[in-house]
Amino acid sequence: MKKYFDKVYKEGMERFQKELYDRLIYDKKTFIITANPETLMTGKENREFDSILCSKNSIITPDGIGVVKGANQVGYHVKERVTGVDIVKYLFSILDKEGRSLYLFGAKPDIVNTLAKKVSDKYPGIQIVGTVDGYVDDKDAVFDDMAIKKPDVVLVALGIPMQEIMINRHYHKFDKGIFIGVGGAFDVLSGMKKREPHFFVNHNLEWLYRICSEPKRLKRFYRSNIKYLDEIRKMKRNMR
């Protein structure tokens, strides 16, 4: 767990936005992984994903409050959450302003198509060069298409760890571009699924709202977070 916390972005959203802007403007290739405790525990259990999390190519942002609090309890200073949804919304604004291009890959057909239309309507300056759902048989071919079109931002919604594995597999084909695995963010960004109410967001309780709304999440949440808390306890004991 320490090697993940060493890499987690610690400076907060405002600073990250400035760095993202520079990376976009100067065409600096970037691979962002937005992490909650389940993400980090998947890395502990999946060797390929572990190598991606630890790679010098990737930036890990603290999407979940559990990552912020866990890291801070074992001697790190992570300022605040830097969430995938907020990163994407910021990227939409600067893509629109700068007239840059976007590729959307993942989720169900109706969701990704609705998102593409919503982005086009709200951000007319964005050039959407690809809209592909996550149910295509040949996902590698989608990345070949991206390599031809050279988008400035690529959003991949295939779920962890598949989205990161696919990005990593094809990352060498690109000279530029900001690549982000966004999980279920297309559902929220498209408006097909409402983001958690402000109370839950402001108090970092989105996880509670999701469990109440979708009880089937409870088993997965419980399993990954109990293991994560155990990792934090072990690290704290070793600090004594």
Predicted regions and their residues:
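Conserved beta-alpha
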Residues: 68-145, 149
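A transmembrane-helix-recognition feature enriched in membrane-embedded lipid enzymes
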Residues: 66-71, 195-240
